[in-house]
C-alpha cells in the first residue's frame, strides 16, 4: 500500500513530508530551548531552513542524476531515517554540515559530464571544507572526492 502511494512522484508527497518534518523539528526544538527571544527564534528558523534545504537538495540530486525512477521513495527514506533518529536534529552543526556535504555531492555527481572538471573538483572540495568547519568528521567526505578524482581523470 505504501509502495503504491509513493510510486509516482507528486507534489502532495512533498507537502506531506514537509509538514511531518516541520512538526518533528518543532517538537524536538520546543522541548530543548527555554528562551523565546528574537535571536534564538532566528537561529531555529535558520536551522529549519537548512534542514529542509538538505531534504530538497537530496531529492534534487537523486532525480537529476536518475538514481531512482520518477517516484518519492528517496524523500520517504530521508524522512523515515530522520523520524527514526530525531536526536540528529538536536545538533545544529550537523544539520549545516549535512547541507554543505549535499552541495558537495551535487558537484561530484555532475562530474560524469567531464566538462570543467577542475572547477567542479574545487567546488566540491570547498563545500566539504565548509562542512568540516561545522563538524570535524565531515572531513571523511574527502575520500569519495579523491576516489572520483582518480576514477574520472
Model-derived regions: residue spans:
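Membrane-interface transmembrane helices that cradle and orient dolichyl/undecaprenyl
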Residues: 66, 104-119
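Membrane-interface alpha helices of multi-pass inner-membrane proteins
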Residues: 122-136
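Transmembrane-helix signature of polytopic, membrane-embedded enzymes
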Residues: 62-81
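Juxtamembrane "helix-exit" motif on the non-cytosolic side of transmembrane helices
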Residues: 26-36
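Aromatic- and kink-enriched transmembrane "portal" helix at the membrane-lumen/periplasm boundary
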Residues: 76-95
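Transmembrane-helix motifs of polytopic, lipid-linked glycan transferases
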Residues: 49-65
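N-terminal membrane topogenic signal
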Residues: 1-19, 68-69
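Perimembrane helix-loop-helix junctions
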Residues: 141-153
Amino acid at each position: 500500500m505504501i509502495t503504491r502511494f509513493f510510486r509516482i512522484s507528486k507534489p502532495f508527497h512533498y507537502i506531506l513530508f514537509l509538514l511531518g518534518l516541520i512538526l518533528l523539528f518543532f517538537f524536538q526544538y520546543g522541548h530543548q530551548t527555554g528562551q523565546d527571544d528574537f535571536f534564538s527564534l532566528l537561529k531555529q528558523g535558520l536551522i529549519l531552513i537548512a534542514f529542509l534545504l538538505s531534504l530538497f537538495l537530496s531529492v534534487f540530486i537523486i532525480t537529476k542524476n536518475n538514481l531512482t525512477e520518477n517516484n518519492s521513495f528517496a524523500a520517504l527514506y530521508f524522512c523515515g531515517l530522520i523520524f527514526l533518529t530525531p536526536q540528529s536534529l538536536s545538533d545544529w552543526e550537523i544539520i549545516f554540515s549535512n547541507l554543505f556535504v549535499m552541495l558537495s555531492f551535487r558537484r561530484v555527481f555532475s562530474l560524469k559530464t567531464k566538462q570543467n572538471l577542475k572547477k567542479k573538483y574545487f567546488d566540491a572540495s570547498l563545500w566539504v571544507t565548509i562542512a568540516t568547519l561545522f563538524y570535524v568528521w565531515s572531513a571523511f567526505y574527502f575520500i569519495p572526492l579523491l576516489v572520483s578524482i582518480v576514477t574520472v581523470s
